[in-house]
Amino acid sequence: MSFKNAISWFEIPATDLSRAQKFYEAIFGITMIPLDTPNLKMRMFPLEDMMTGVGGAVVDSGGFHKPSATDGPLIYLNANPDVQLVLDKVGAAGGKIIVPKTTISPEYGDMAVIIDTEGNRIAFHSVPKG
C-alpha cells in the first residue's frame, strides 16, 4: 500500500482558541473555518479538497491535547513559496522563531521551527519550484 499523503488530518492544541486563530491567520494570510462539536472547538485551515489534501485545525479540546514546545510529534506546515515569507510575520503575530530558515537540500527545500502563541513547537517547509 502507498499513500498520496501519509497524514490525513492534524490538530494543533490551543488554550486560547481566539489568540491561536489570529496568529495563524496573520502569518499565513488566511481565514480559518470555525467547526465546533459538543466536545471540541476547532478552527480549520482552509483546504481545497478534503479527499486528496491534508486537513487540520487549531483545537481547544478541554485538555485532551496540551501545547508543548518540546514533546510529541513535529508538524510541518506548508510555507510555499518561501519559508522566510511566513517567518517574517511570526514575531509580530506573537510567536518566536527557534530554528531560522535552514536549507535541507536544493531539491528538498527549506525548513524552520517556531513556537506559536499557545506554546506549540511547529515547523514550516517550502519546496523550490522545479
Map each language-model feature to its residues.
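N-terminal beta-strand motif that seeds the catalytic metal site of vicinal oxygen chelate
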Residues: M1-Q21, P73-I75, H125-G130
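Core segments of cupin and vicinal oxygen chelate
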Residues: S2, E11-V54
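Vicinal oxygen chelate
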Residues: I7-T15, F64-G91, D110-I115
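Conserved active-site tyrosine of GNAT-family acetyltransferases
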Residues: A20-Y24, V90, G119
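Short acidic/glycine-enriched loop/turn segments that link adjacent beta-strands
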Residues: P38-M42, S105-D110
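Active-site beta-strand termini and strand-to-loop segments that position acidic
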Residues: F45-M50, I114-T117, V127
